A protein has these predicted regions:
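Nucleotide-activated sugar donor-binding and catalytic core shared by glycosyltransferases
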Residues: 1-247
C-alpha cells in the first residue's frame, strides 16, 4: 500500500482471530458420539491429495499402540470422498463414509467425513487434529479453528499460509510439527495417552487464539471515522416522500 502512495498504513493483524468457533448440530454431535462410544479419536482435517495415504499409514502404526483408535479424515474437498475411500479400502483399511450414510462400528478404522460444514462437529469429538495441506506443498490450513474448540494441534512443515499464527503458536509451545507418517503416529499416540501434555497444549493454543479475538472491533473503530464522513447526508429541506396505496 505504501508503494501505491498511501501515507499511513496500519496492519491490525489476521482477521481469522475474530472468527467465532465453528458451529455444530447438537443432534449430529449426540448421534456421532454415540457411534464412537469411548474409543480414542483423532482427526486429519482439510487434507489434500497425497495426505490421506500418509494418515492411513500413521493409523496402521497407531493401532499397534492404541488398538481401538478411530481415525477421522476430513478432506478439504468433499467431492474426493468416494475416491479416497476406494483407495484406502484397496490397501486393506476398513472404512466408513459419512456422505454415503455409513455408520461407524467396532471394526471401522478410518471414518471419511466428506460433507460440507461439519468441521466444528469433528473438532468437538476429536482430542487431537492433524492440520492438512501441510505434508504436501500447499501451505497449510487454518489452525485457529482447532485451537478454539479444544483440539490439540499437529501439523507438517508446509504452513506458509499461516506463518505468523504458527510462529505465535510455536512460541507458546502449543503445536507440534511432524515430517512423515511415523512422526505423525508417534505424536498422535503421545497426545492421546498423555492427558497432562494435551491439556497444556490446549491451554496454550486457546490463549493464542483468544487474545486477539477483539481484532475486528479494532478494525471497525479505525474505519468508523471514514465511514461516517463518507455517508450521504439527508436533505432535511426536502418534503417527505408520500406513500401511495395500491388497490
Amino acid at each position: 500500500m505504501t508503494a501505491l502512495g498511501a501515507r499511513k498504513v496500519q496492519v491490525p493483524g489476521n482477521l481469522k482471530y475474530a472468527a467465532a468457533p465453528l458451529p455444530a448440530s447438537d443432534t449430529d454431535l449426540h448421534d456421532l458420539a454415540r457411534m464412537i462410544g469411548d474409543r480414542p479419536v483423532w482427526a486429519a482435517v482439510s487434507t489434500h491429495q497425497g495426505e490421506e495415504e500418509i494418515v492411513a499409514a500413521a493409523h496402521t502404526d497407531l493401532v499397534q499402540k492404541i488398538p481401538d483408535v478411530l481415525t477421522i479424515i476430513v478432506p478439504r474437498h468433499p467431492i474426493r470422498g468416494e475416491d479416497i475411500t476406494n483407495r484406502l479400502q484397496s490397501t486393506g483399511h476398513i472404512t466408513a463414509r459419512r456422505a454415503a450414510g455409513q455408520a461407524i462400528d467396532s471394526d471401522t478404522g478410518l471414518y471419511i467425513v466428506d460433507t460440507v460444514g461439519e468441521l466444528g462437529l469433528i473438532y468437538r469429538l476429536a482430542k487431537v487434529a492433524f492440520i492438512g495441506g501441510s505434508l504436501v506443498p500447499h501451505g497449510g490450513q487454518n489452525l485457529l479453528e482447532a485451537a478454539k474448540l479444544d483440539c490439540a494441534i499437529v501439523h507438517g512443515p508446509s504452513m506458509t499460509n499461516f506463518t505468523a499464527i504458527v510462529a505465535e503458536m510455536r512460541h507458546a509451545a502449543a503445536i507440534e510439527e511432524i515430517l512423515d507418517s511415523k512422526e505423525l503416529a508417534s505424536a498422535i499416540a503421545t497426545l492421546l495417552r498423555n492427558d497432562d501434555l494435551r491439556s497444556r497444549r490446549l491451554k496454550a493454543a486457546a490463549q493464542v487464539a483468544m487474545k486477539k479475538d477483539s481484532i475486528l472491533d479494532n478494525v471497525i473503530a479505525e474505519l468508523a471515522p471514514f465511514l461516517d464522513s463518507a455517508a450521504p447526508r439527508a436533505d432535511v429541506s426536502a418534503p417527505p416522500a408520500r406513500c401511495h396505496a395500491q388497490s
